[in-house]
Amino acid sequence: MATQVMGQSSGGGSLFNNSANMGMALTNDMYDLHELSKAELAAPQLIMLANVALTGEASGSCCDYLVGEERQMAELMPVGDNHFSESEGEGLEESADLKGLENMELGSLELSAVEPQPVFEASAAPEIYSANKDPAPETPVAEDKCRSSKAKPFRCKPCQYEAESEEQFVHHIRIHSAKKFFVEESAEKQAKAWESGSSPAEEGEFSKGPIRCDRCGYNTNRYDHYMAHLKHHLRAGENERIYKCIICTYTTVSEYHWRKHLRNHFPRKVYTCSKCNYFSDRKNNYVQHVRTHTGERPYKCELCPYSSSQKTHLTRHMRTHSGEKPFKCDQCNYVASNQHEVTRHARQVHNGPKPLNCPHCDYKTADRSNFKKHVELHVNPRQFNCPVCDYAASKKCNLQYHFKSKHPTCPSKTMDVSKVKLKKTKKREADLLNNAVSNEKMENEQTKTKGDVSGKKNEKPVKAVGKDASKEKKPGSSVSVVQVTTRTRKSAVAAETKAAEVKHTDGQTGNNPEKPCKAKKNKRKKDAEAHPSEEPVNEGPVTKKKKKSECKSKIGTNVPKGGGRAEERPGVKKQSASLKKGTKKTPPKTKTSKKGGKLAPKGMGQTEPSSGALAQVGVSPDPALIQAEVTGSGSSQTELPSPMDIAKSEPAQMEVSLTGPPPVEPAQMEPSPAKPPQVEAPTYPQPPQRGPAPPTGPAPPTGPAPPTEPAPPTGLAEMEPSPTEPSQKEPPPSMEPPCPEELPQAEPPPMEDCQKELPSPVEPAQIEVAQTAPTQVQEEPPPVSEPPRVKPTKRSSLRKDRAEKELSLLSEMARQEQVLMGVGLVPVRDSKLLKGNKSAQDPPAPPSPSPKGNSREETPKDQEMVSDGEGTIVFPLKKGGPEEAGESPAELAALKESARVSSSEQNSAMPEGGASHSKCQTGSSGLCDVDTEQKTDTVPMKDSAAEPVSPPTPTVDRDAGSPAVVASPPITLAENESQEIDEDEGIHSHDGSDLSDNMSEGSDDSGLHGARPTPPEATSKNGKAGLAGKVTEGEFVCIFCDRSFRKEKDYSKHLNRHLVNVYFLEEAAEEQEEQEEREEQE
């Protein structure tokens, strides 16, 4: 960066680098301008440069005039006269008391001479005028004013004159001549000076704007500048001295500012940019300018990523963080963080002067930038075209908003507004005046619009397919999202609303039969892309969808496979979205019930069952039959009678939950007896584990207590936690490792398998069976009609207000923690839960179906879902747990006691209790096996994981089965809850959600931490009792779902996801579904 500093000696040395004197001979004619009349001079434009110097006498030996050895200000005035008059000299003497302007960096302004430095911006080193050089021939002013299209190296800053050669530039400077700077003590004297020194025409030309000060003649087009100027008058009072620049219109009452202003015209040092024509006499300005080329932004905000090249910008930015608003409107109480806002306010509210008038309309403003933008709208209206539709915006911001609101599902490429092409338009005048130009413009626009329309057409079918068929690329189509939201909302409303949902989904599917087909086709295409052959692809998505939508898709799917797919997806999406929403809002159904009229817990569990599980109830009341169907074909699971059955089974489930297992529908009752035999089958492996179970005898009592704890929140992952808790309780030493194994392999797959089979055994039946079976498990696993101990958990209790639930949960958590601590289960739980969480995290993240399955499992959140190799049993323990937890600590204690008794009984009768629990784990493993058999082609990863897990799980699960049956719900809640939350959080990412969610239960930020005696366990509200062991002091608890996080980072991410869900539920659901579908395809 060549910076040229043109020094000038105070002693009057030459201004240029060489001491050689400029050859601008100054005779009595003064600058050889005697021939030019005053009118011919560029006096009005005499804004003598930032770069010019008046040079010495005729001898040229010195640049300074010394008269009487007194220094006086140089008087720059139009050169009509040959020399300065005595009166002018006297005027200069009056201002001599300013003591020279060397302090002002004007160098030495001698009598009748000013030493501004000529700056030749174009050249790195300005050429030196030789002493012998003759003045350039005088040329008419017209030539001086002419502008050449070529880049000219010599520019006069004040008047923007550009010269091609040095001679022209020197001549232009001489024409400017020396115009006097003078300072008057009063406005009257200045007025006289103006009258004597310049003509009215000149004054008019000097006029800078419509706003003029009556006291000193200051004028500007900036209202804020004018107001600031008036303050100077107020400060100075009546005896003010007005300092005025005659080269320009600058006027001030401050000597300091006046001297500072003079530097603009007579810079002592000039810093020139080597990359452009910029130059400045202020080093700070020059350095800031250089940063525009280098991109350096040294001033960074410590609170956000903002950075700036100027400190003033950073200072202004920091006000956005501090909220400081130092600028106040003079006419009202309006305050702002910067003066520009105040000026705008004054202009808009107080009707400040608006000198700029739009030639096309009545628009007026004082802001040039706004004026230009406004006029541009007349000339080029709506020049930003949407590449997707016919919409055209006048501003980029409007087009960007259009993208987000109208095309949220379009590829990100089209979202890049910076790449949006503008309409080809001519300049305003051409557009306004030339019809031909306008016609061409219209043609160009039409062609562009045609291209846009064609592009839109190409994209529209995709959109239609996406909307109708859940969009090929984005699994979460608008239609599926709508269905999801409607189902989730209806399910949240009530079981009746669930039936309405079923009808609605049926109506939707019936009304839009093509959409499912398209969705199927799109899904098949996606599957085909993911898999070489469509058959395996279909099988994979079908099986996965079976996992996800065996319960969900059955609601509205008449076709077992194709329709099942199309509807399974919407159903799965809806149900999964509902589960996600429910879980996000409140991992326990309790919270979801609050949202959806507190039927959501039921709806969460029942909504999915209603859509898929209830359908399954209608399809096959017997779990064995359902399992057989599942194993046989996922299409059988997607039978159309399911909607009717769902509508029926949902109320039945509601009744069952309220009345208990006894009112369970015959179909549900049948599955319960069928399940006991299933339990018996897995029971055989359990008896061998009974040995370990007795050692964990203390665990059983604790097992029931934990189930009650997690039960309220844990309807989501009952399947998986059940094995984890039993393993933690009964076989802590030997079972703990298997539990982790089972958790990673069996638990997540059981989640999927159970989810698959749970829908298959009919979730309503499972719910009722859960009520009956858990009662059997708690009281006596063999008798199906012993649910009284479990106390049929009324979902109405789940629907209790969240505050009451939290209070009851807190008391429960405290008691549970005490019980667990007394039993010593907390550490076991922690280790196993951690392992289970990891395992749950691993499977759910890669296979989206597992999260969906988890969400389906979530549907029976309130019920423990125990799955045997053939069928699944849903235990109302979770319901009872959450209900009791929500109801009262006494009930919780009673439930714990009953659970302990049942666990002891189960330990004594391992075949039964273990069978029931083993149903959860062995069922999960068996389900994994069955599902793996069904879905081996589609889900080899899950199947393999589930199958290897299944053999160890039956043994381990059965060992821990009796107490674990009761304890399983809480752990499952933790795991399933985490998985559900993962799905919810999976909206952003499926990976690591379990860890962050499970690791975070008991946050100080949640506000719930203080109320809980033991944050680790207490933080795991009912369903998080399993995770309670992990919770430690200082953790962060989510205020929405009470999930605890050990790391603030994870907690903040989780909280942000809740917020996103609150404001963008549909979009989030769509994204989640898309991710899940992608995973399925992969």
From Swiss-Prot:
Effect of gene disruption? Embryonic lethality by embryonic day 11.5 dpc. At 9.25 dpc, disorganization of the head mesenchyme in the midbrain region with separation of myotomal cells from the dermomyotome and widespread apoptotic cell death. Forebrain malformation and widening of the mesencephalic flexure at 9.5 dpc and 10.5 dpc, and growth retardation by 10.5 dpc. Conditional knockout in the nervous system results in a progressive age-related neurodegenerative phenotype.
* Segments for region (Required for binding to the neuron-restrictive silencer element): 196-207
Q: What induces the gene encoding this protein?
A: Down-regulated in differentiating neurons and mature neurons.
Q: List the residue ranges of the region (Interaction with SIN3A).
A: 32-117
- How would you describe the post-translational modification of this protein? O-glycosylated.
Per UniProt, the ranges with Pro residues bias are 684-713, 729-751
Sites where Phosphoserine occurs are at: S950
Q: Which UniProt keywords apply?
A: Cytoplasm, Metal-binding, Nucleus, Phosphoprotein, Repeat, Repressor, Transcription, Transcription regulation, Ubl conjugation, Zinc, Zinc-finger
Its localization reads: Nucleus; Cytoplasm
**What segment(s) does the record annotate as region Interaction with ZFP90?**
140-413
Q: Name one GO biological process term.
A: response to ischemia
Q: Which Gene3D superfamilies match?
A: Classic Zinc Finger
Q: Where are the zinc fingers (C2H2-type)?
A: 154-176, 211-235, 243-265, 271-293, 299-321, 327-350, 356-378, 384-407, 1036-1058
Region: Interaction with SIN3B; residue ranges are 43-57
Q: Where is the composition biased (Polar residues)?
A: 630-640, 900-909
Tissue specificity annotation:
Expressed in the hippocampus, including quiescent neuronal progenitor (QNP) cells, transient-amplifying progenitor (TAP) cells, neuroblasts and mature neurons (at protein level). Expressed in embryonic stem cells (at protein level). Expressed in many non-neuronal tissues including the heart and liver. Abundantly expressed in osteoblastic lineage cells. Expressed in the spleen, kidney, blood cells, cortex, neocortex and in the utricle, saccule and organ of Corti of the inner ear. Isoform 2: Expressed in the cortex, neocortex and in the utricle, saccule and organ of Corti of the inner ear.
Q: Write out the function statement from the record.
A: Transcriptional repressor which binds neuron-restrictive silencer element (NRSE) and represses neuronal gene transcription in non-neuronal cells. Restricts the expression of neuronal genes by associating with two distinct corepressors, SIN3A and RCOR1, which in turn recruit histone deacetylase to the promoters of REST-regulated genes. Mediates repression by recruiting the BHC complex at RE1/NRSE sites which acts by deacetylating and demethylating specific sites on histones, thereby acting as a chromatin modifier.
Q: What is this protein called?
A: RE1-silencing transcription factor
Organism name: Mus musculus
Q: What taxonomic classification does the UniProt entry list for its organism?
A: Eukaryota, Metazoa, Chordata, Craniata, Vertebrata
| The encoding gene | Rest
